[in-house]
A protein has these predicted regions:
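Short acidic/glycine- and proline-prone juxtamembrane loop motifs at membrane-interface regions
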Residues: 131-141, 316-317
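Membrane-interface transmembrane helices that cradle and orient dolichyl/undecaprenyl
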Residues: 109-111, 147-165, 173, 197-198, ...
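Short periplasmic/luminal acceptor-recognition loop of GT-C membrane glycosyltransferases, typified by
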Residues: 371-430, 440-463
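Transmembrane-helix motifs of polytopic, lipid-linked glycan transferases
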Residues: 90-111, 119, 148, 280-281
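Membrane-interface alpha helices of multi-pass inner-membrane proteins
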Residues: 162-178, 184-189, 213, 302-311
Length: 512
């Protein structure tokens, strides 16, 4: 074998872990590609991009609770998808794949063991293969940039310039999801412990500059457009009100792991193995090692990811995405090859169980990409709605925002996300800023947009709530110039929702 052949084989070997992770990403993320809606957040984020499409800044005419960079990223990806929800979902798979690659590189840098590193990354992908995680949450986008920043710091610890790049990456994360600013704290603490005062000062100045520049740019842009009030409300006032709601609790965390055990016992056992072996090894450490472990960056990231979940306050599983990523760093605490081997075997069993259960369905979805969107019920409902109009028309949607996405329309309402109409803290802030009027829902309906989409009932924090106290969804009962569409065929379609909601209806009213 000549030198050229050997070099080609070596390059191929380096490529194998990434090809493996990409394959696992596709299989685990596309089990439910044929289901149109798994979570309603994504549809709302897509509609928020209409601001940018129409030449406005994020949150100028369509309000969502996330940072401006997140809305811009959604805009670019949805633009690339050209109205195809299926393509957009696949683009989110690419973001998850690169995030798993960053995790692999971080584990490999510390462990110098490809098998255990690929096992940790595979476990993360298996955890992200659950139904609730198959969406483009802001946490995933932010995690992409946080993990990139940590990888830069880990690989280029002795280059002050790279701390500037890491700061830029961290800044982007906070401009995606405001709460991720909490992950800057463990980096500051860790760097303080690892460096003398001079080096610490230089690195923090470089990183701080990188963090500040993107924020200053957005502050200037929003100030020039007289939108600083809504910018600060979205970044500070409303998130702090959100935190004070205090809905999260330890019990819901145990429910999450119980459900995980029911879905894939070996994935659950992998997490238990990580935690139990790490705690056992940690308990036998000396005082000096205990002190070092306390200030270790990777341990602190796990701790702060738990804080993020509880600060999030609403028991939403997607607030656990950071924990599911950072908990893989417990692999650094394994003391011997037997522990690493046992963990890798358990992850392998979890992977095999997942493939046996889901691979055929995922591959079937991936082989039928051109047909899937045509089977989406809300997509077909949007075509029916559009058939009633020749020119432009306005749509007021209190639910089923995907219809707006398919129609390429902005919402007639300033608030986009359906549940935010019923969050008192949000409504109060937006009213104080003059973004909403008193009884704004009634006034929106009274202004008689061409299409009104609503739902008379909604599950709010686990409880079914009749919405007639806020407004009467049966618009055609009191506005005789509206006709109600028969949407039963769309409502009972098996591809509509992953989570069946017996209380929901699809009420669509067309102005005659």
């Amino acid at each position: 074998m000549n030198k050229v052949d050997k070099s080609q084989i070596n390059r191929l070997r380096k490529f194998i872990p990434y090809a493996f992770l990409f394959s696992i990403t596709l299989i685990t993320q596309n089990i439910y590609l044929n289901i149109e809606t798994i979570e309603w957040d994504i549809a709302s984020y897509l509609i928020a991009t209409q601001d940018i499409k129409l030449g406005f800044l994020p949150n100028e005419t369509q309000w969502e609770s996330k940072g401006p960079v997140f809305i811009y990223l959604y805009f670019f990806l949805s633009n690339f998808a050209k109205g195809s929800l299926v393509t957009f979902k696949l683009l989110n798979d690419v973001i998850l794949f690169f995030t798993s690659v960053f995790l692999f590189e971080l584990l490999l840098k510390k462990l110098d063991n490809k098998i255990i590193s690929i096992s940790g990354s595979t476990l993360f992908l298996l955890l992200m293969g659950q139904s609730w995680a198959l969406s483009g949450y802001s946490e995933l986008y932010a995690l992409f940039f946080i993990s990139l920043a940590i990888l830069i710091i880990t690989k280029f610890r002795y280059s002050n310039l790279h701390y500037f790049y890491a700061g830029i990456s961290l800044s982007i994360a906070t401009l995606i999801n405001q709460g991720t600013a909490i992950f800057i704290i463990p980096i500051l603490i860790s760097e303080y412990i690892l460096n003398n005062k001079k080096n610490y000062f230089l690195k923090i100045v470089m990183m701080g500059t990188g963090i500040l520049i993107p924020h200053i740019v957005f502050l200037i842009v929003y100030s020039m457009n007289n939108l600083l009030d809504i910018y600060f409300a979205t970044f500070l006032t409303i998130p702090f009100a959100y935190i004070q709601a205090q809905y999260a609790n330890v019990y819901e965390l145990t429910v999450f792991f119980r459900e995980l055990a029911e879905i894939n016992f070996y994935v659950y056992l992998s997490i238990i193995t990580l935690v139990v072996l790490s705690i056992s090894n940690f308990a036998t450490s000396s005082y000096l090692k205990y002190k070092n472990e306390f200030f270790d960056l990777y341990n602190q990231l796990i701790f702060f990811s738990l804080i993020f979940y509880f600060v999030g306050s609403h028991n939403y599983y997607h607030h656990l995405i950071f924990l599911l990523f950072f908990i893989q760093f417990l692999l650094f605490k394994f003391l011997n090859s037997k522990q690493k081997f046992f963990f890798s075997v358990v992850v392998l069993f979890g992977l095999l169980l997942n493939l046996n259960t889901n691979m055929e369905k995922s591959l079937n979805n991936l082989n039928n990409l051109s047909y899937i969107q045509n089977e989406y019920p809300l997509y077909n409902l949007s075509k029916e709605i559009d058939s009633y109009f020749q020119g432009d028309y306005e749509v007021l949607a209190f639910d089923y925002n995907l219809i707006l996405y398919y129609l390429d329309k902005k919402n007639y309402s300033y608030i986009v996300h359906p549940s935010n109409h019923y969050e008192e803290d949000i409504i109060k802030v937006l009213k104080n800023l003059g973004k909403l009027e008193e009884n704004y829902i009634e006034k929106l309906i009274d202004s008689e947009p061409d299409v009104i989409i609503c739902n008379p009932r909604m599950i709010i924090r686990g409880e079914p709530v009749q919405l007639n106290k806020l407004f009467n969804c049966e618009v055609s009962d009191y506005k005789k110039n509206y006709v109600k569409l028969d949407t039963r065929e769309y409502l009972i379609d098996k591809n509509l929702n992953y989570y069946f909601d017996p209380y929901k209806e699809i009420s669509v009213f067309i102005k005659r």
